[in-house]
Amino acid sequence: MSASAVNVDPAELGKFAAHAARWWDAGGAARPLHDLNPVRVQWIAARVALRGARVLDAGCGGGLLSEALAARGARVTGIDLTPQLIEVAKLHLHESGLDVDYRVQGAEDLARAEPEAFDVACCLELIEHVPDPAALLRALADLLRPGGALVLSTLNRTPRAFVGAILGAESLLRLLPRGTHRYARFMRPSELAAMLRDAGMQLVELAGLGYEPLSRRAWVSRRVDINYLALARKPG
């Protein structure tokens, strides 16, 4: 399938493909994801039943979240449109001994092939990288069984998020490669809630994600003005 046939920005794929080889290096370009991952997984596990559940990790990258969910007993399918990252994710399974079904595939394509196949869908740090986030959310809703849960994380479109995620993380501290984020694609919670409603889902919980890059400490907070987590439910 060509890039034009799916909800993808080729420039975004190129950014992440360039760092595929060091995805599992906790001191590399994916360092913030390594630091945030345990906190995010704990937040997810406190809200949805993972053991035995069929879980989708959309935009799985090199598999950080997928493996953590599989370690908690979930039956995980990880999808990403960057072949280099899927290859890294598959190779890392030889080290971890975990079982994850990795595929080079987009959510829209998977929704056509396997509608209502998942109990839980996770979409972390992806929605701000696609050209049509509403289409992505509709596909994720279609992939969920009635009563299923959707977990998202993204960046709020606020001055504080611009300073922290772009000026700070990319330009000053160089924690992320320059150009990783585009401020115009950051999403306010109210915008996310509206898109979820249009997709037939309901936003039920928001939480902020705090991160101190120098100490590499991450935590859940009440402030959602930079990075935030969201839980939505499909009726049923």
Report residues per predicted region:
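N-terminal, positively charged/glycine-rich alpha-helical extensions of SAM-dependent methyltransferases
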Residues: 1-24
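Acceptor-substrate binding/catalytic loop of class I
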Residues: 174-191
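A short acidic, Gly/Pro-enriched loop at the edge of an enzyme's catalytic core
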Residues: 111-120
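A short glycine-rich, Lys/Arg-flanked "PGG" loop and its adjoining helix->strand segment in the class I
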Residues: 134-149
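Conserved class I S-adenosyl-L-methionine
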Residues: 53-59, 151-173
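Class I SAM-dependent methyltransferase SAM/SAH-binding core
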Residues: 62-109
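Conserved alpha-helix/loop element of class I SAM-dependent methyltransferases that forms part
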Residues: 34-51
